[in-house]
Amino acid sequence: MEGGDSTISVAGRGASGSAVVAATVQAILQDDCYSEFLNEDFDVKTYTSQSIHQAVIAEQLAKLAQGISQLDKELHLQVVARHEDLLAQATGIESLEGVLQMMQTRIGALQGAVDRMKSKIVEPYNKIVARTAQLARLQVACDLLRRIIRILYLSKRLQGQLQGGSREITKAAQSLNELDYLSQGIDLSGIEVIENDLLFIARARLEVENQAKRLLEQGVETQNPTQVGTALQVFHNLGTLKETVTSVVDGYCAALEDSINNALDVKVLTQPSQSAVRGGPGRAAMPTPGSTAGFRASLWTNMEKLMDHICAACGQVQHLQKVLTKKRDPVSHICFIEEIIKDGQPEILYMFWNAVTLALSSHFHSATNSSMFLKQAFEGEYPKLLRLYNDLWKRLQQSSQNTQGTFSPSGTPDLCVDLPHMEDDTQDMFRLKRPDYDPEKALKDSLQPYEAAYLSKSLSRLFDPINLVFPPGGRNPPSSDELDGITKTITSELNVAAVDANLTLAVSKNVAKTIQLYAVKSEQLLSTQGDASQVIGPLTEGQKRNVGVVNSLFKLHQSVTKVVASQSSFSATAEQTIMSALKTIHDLMGNAIQPLLTSVADAIEAIIITMHQEDFSGASSSSGKPDVPCSLYMKELQGFIARVMNDYFKHFECLDFVFDNTEAIAQRAIELFIRNASLIRPLGEGGKLRLAADFAQMELAVGPLCRRVSDLGKSYRMLRSFRPLLFQTSEHVADSPAVGDIIPFSIIIQFLFTRAPAELKSPFQRAEWSHARFSQWLDDHPSEKDRLLLLRGALEAYVQSVRSRDGKEFAPVYPIMVQLLQKAMSALQ
């Protein structure tokens, strides 16, 4: 019991002591004096140095001693509280030492076994390494011996092939290609047995290359596909096909650049004139004033030679490309053209043509910038330059077609190994344009600056005669001679431009601008004052001037139309361009004559309206004497029209144009005459006879206004059809086949009002309008429906009037008018 109690008391004290110590430790940790010792980067020397510099060293030492004492107590308490765990850890350490000793023993045994294995493996390994090196050297020696044997054999075979000449050249190239392969990746220098052979092979390769180059040049020059194919096969066997073809094309490009420079060299062009007088230092080569013609003659001769050179070079390059396209290697069956373009390189003809066009553009630009004489020659005689280009293009197309014929399957079967006949057509750049590249446009792009300058000068040449014949302040239109001068200038410009369709179109646009300028100048001469449209007295000065302007416009229109018709190579677009401009001339003629036409039409209408001032209500004459053949207004109308045609329109030289405009006046006059004739109320039998005579005379009255009265169409037929209706009954009038077809229903119903009693008023009477105002209303309402509705209103008003007076019946003509109205309304639906 005592022992148990003591144990419990010790444990209790230990627990309470631990709590006290924990609190003490916590106090130490929170104390600034001890907190520095917890830092990971605590340095004893630094701490000591700081403590020495402080004044109270004794206090710090005492503080540290106190802290050490407290920590010792804490450690003691920890050991007492965990003494069983600590004893267990100590026992485990002893066991671990035993395990480690056992592992050390086993590691020693393993090391001994490894040493024994090493002694058994090292010796065989060294032997294997030695044998492997020996085998590798043997293989290298065998490979070298095989190469030497093959080189000796091929060298001997090559000697025989070279003795065979051009017939064996492709085989010689194949042998050389194999010899090159044997020499790759190995150093054969210093081997005496093949030293002479290697020298021979180098000389043979050079000889074969030279022979192949000569064969290629000769074959391309004579366009012999067999020779070209043989040479290409040689270079293919040598492995230099692509490099050789590129070199050949580059050579053609360089030669053409030299030709362009020589053709445009001013010193060469002026050499004859400069031979007598040597230019000093810094003096430019320029043509003397008297030698400009010789300079230009030499220039165009050089240009023709340049075009010949370009054509020949293009033909040779195209021939080369076509052989490349058709030729296949007999062993690999690879088409040669595929070898050229396999790295994305374009076709050689495209490459060459692009280089040619760029060279032309750059050299032409630099040459004309440095020489004003060259620039003036190319700009002033641009059509000649363009003709050379067009001829070159035609020759290239023809040459392309001829080259295609040369490569027919029956002609060179040795070149057409497993290759479709049409495959090379896709390569024909001069006959089949690509969607993304136009070779003809690329060629002519070098001419753009000269074309623009030529067109500008051409426009000036076209404008100059017009500006001369229309001086500032001038009031008279051009004379016939002046118009002839303008026409000759237009003809000359179009004839010179006929060398090219695009140039013709561009010059046609200039001609159109010229015509428009003439129209603007002529319009400024037109008189727009009141006296320009008078039809009372003789021609005024303004009217005379307008007649002269219209006549000059007509002459120009006729002349230019003949010029266009005489151009055999005119395109539809170019012709349409000029004809559109001529339409402005025609429109201006119409505008110039329109005021006079309007005055004539107004005067005719005013005369026709006066028919209502005459009395048509009389009965037929019983004396047997013939009545007046026609009314007074008709005589006045005939006299007026005859006078107008004689005094005004006779002076116009464009009769067809005048009749085209006066025929409309004649048609209008007939329509007004019939309209007003249908409004006459009352109309007696004698009035009908006189009105019938007026109808007959109306044909004669409008005769001067047209070529033939029958050409007036519907108006003339209506005039002829209406006259018999004057004497027919209302029923026959309504049943006439002319009603609705030739004569509008509204006119017939309007005419039937004349046969009705006064109570049935005409529409204008009901509205209390004058005849002139009613006629104006009809002009403002051309719709037949509007006119019929107006007539229906008059009939309905009549019905209301009858009913309002309690009438028992309607006028006999009323049902006929209603029937016609219903028929007319039905026809409109």
From Swiss-Prot:
Cross-referenced Pfam families: COG5_C, COG5_N
Biological process, per Gene Ontology: glycosylation; Golgi organization; inter-Golgi cisterna vesicle-mediated transport; protein transport; retrograde transport, vesicle recycling within Golgi
Record bears the keyword Cytoplasm: yes
SUBUNIT field: Component of the conserved oligomeric Golgi complex which is composed of eight different subunits and is required for normal Golgi morphology and localization.
GO cellular component term of the entry, any: Golgi transport complex
Membrane topology label: Peripheral membrane protein
Subcellular location(s) of the protein: Cytoplasm, Cytosol; Golgi apparatus membrane
Record key words, sorted: Cytoplasm, Golgi apparatus, Membrane, Phosphoprotein, Protein transport, Transport
Signal peptide bounds: none
Protein name: Conserved oligomeric Golgi complex subunit 5
Family as reported in the entry's similarity comment: Belongs to the COG5 family.
